[in-house]
Amino acid sequence: MPTRAVSDTLDRVMPSRLQCLIVDDSDAFCVAARRLLESAGMSVVGTATSLASAIDAVLSTHPDLVLVDIDLGADSGFDVVEAIDAQDLTPPPAVILVSTHDEEDFADLVNNSSAQGFLSKFELSANAIEALLGT
């Protein structure tokens, strides 16, 4: 199973101060997630709706954390995760996959990806992110 070191940035920054990029093709989810995370003190540096726009946003905003929807319509969230990993960023952003589907539906794919893990969209919160990242 591929592993990814949590970025040095995450060791220095409180979870509520993380700079987050949201990658999802649902405008409604992006708006709701932004409000939820910003109300907890996180900074949302942008949103993206596709693999190409996600890579552009990662390179231009340098987020500490990227939340990636597994189903992006024409693109796969797993492809986004691997494309981010291929950028060889230092430090690399932490990547968390999100979905409305159950974690069990994607467990093997999540475990074999370079993402830190999975969160259900219904359980998304700053506390859940903090728990998943172990910070």
Map each language-model feature to its residues:
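Acidic catalytic/metal-coordinating carboxylates
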Residues: 50-53, 76-79
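As written
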Residues: 77, 109-117
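Short hydrophobic/Thr-rich beta-strand motif most characteristic of the beta2 strand and flanking loop
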Residues: 41-49, 57
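Conserved acidic segment of CheY-like receiver
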Residues: 17-28, 33-37
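The feature encodes the CheY-like receiver
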Residues: 73
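Non-catalytic signal-transmission and effector/linker regions of two-component phosphorelay proteins
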Residues: 1-19, 29, 124-135
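Active-site T/S-Asp motif of two-component receiver
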Residues: 66-69
